Amino acid sequence: MEPLIHPLLDEATVSHLRASLLTDETSWQDGRKTAGYQAAEVKNNLQLKRYSKTAKENSQLVIEKLESDPLVKSFALPRHIHGVMFSRSGIGQGYGMHVDNAYMSSGRSDLSFTLFLSEPESYDGGALCIQTLQDSKQVKLPAGQLIIYPSTSLHAVETVTAGERLVCVGWIQSYISSNEDRTILFGLNAGARALLAEHGRSPELDLIFQAYTNLLRRLGS
């Protein structure tokens, strides 16, 4: 399944988030405290304490944006968005190659997301590297954009060599656990919606939407 790269937050919302997060200096802690056994050995960053007031308020803002975004809903078919946290990496910090846990305390991880909150020119290094079968995809997006990718992927964050990287990360438990099935449904839904926008409703299109809905019902969990 190819990742989805998508603008989620406008400039004003990003500025509000960044100011709120960076003002609360007392709530940041060693990121290894939230990592699994395998990942803790290669994790070197700071994370906002998940149950702090700042984390709760801003996590809810991000979740609401994700839940109301039509493209995110069509791509991810989210049943539960969970584990949302904020991390920052300064000079010398990063996150070595690892795979996310299959199950968090808050739910199953089918899809992972990273929402960038720092402009790419404000720091050097810090790219998200997602391992594919033959190579590695490097991602460093403008502030407000996010990438959603399968949680089954090996991935890493390059060491930051200048500036500071600020992101929001989290996981999605999808109604469809299979990446392949989710890709098929996403393509079918996108095609049907494009036909609807161009030609309007028709009996033939009703059959396509019926097939999509029944496939979702059959494949869903």
Curated annotation (Swiss-Prot):
Residues holding Fe cation: H98, D100, H155
Domain annotation Fe2OG dioxygenase: ranges: 80-174
Pfam families attached to this UniProt entry: 2OG-FeII_Oxy_3
Cofactor binding summary note: Binds 1 Fe(2+) ion per subunit.
Highest taxon of the lineage: Bacteria
Keyword Magnesium: no
Keywords, sorted A to Z: Dioxygenase, Iron, Metal-binding, Oxidoreductase, Vitamin C
Stretches that traverse the bilayer: none
Coiled coil: none
Residues annotated for 2-oxoglutarate binding in this entry: R165
Keyword RNA-binding: no
Catalytic activity, EC: 1.14.11.-
Cofactor names: Fe(2+); L-ascorbate
PANTHER family: PKHD-TYPE HYDROXYLASE YBIX
Name the record gives this protein: PKHD-type hydroxylase P9303_20491
Annotated source species: Prochlorococcus marinus (strain MIT 9303)
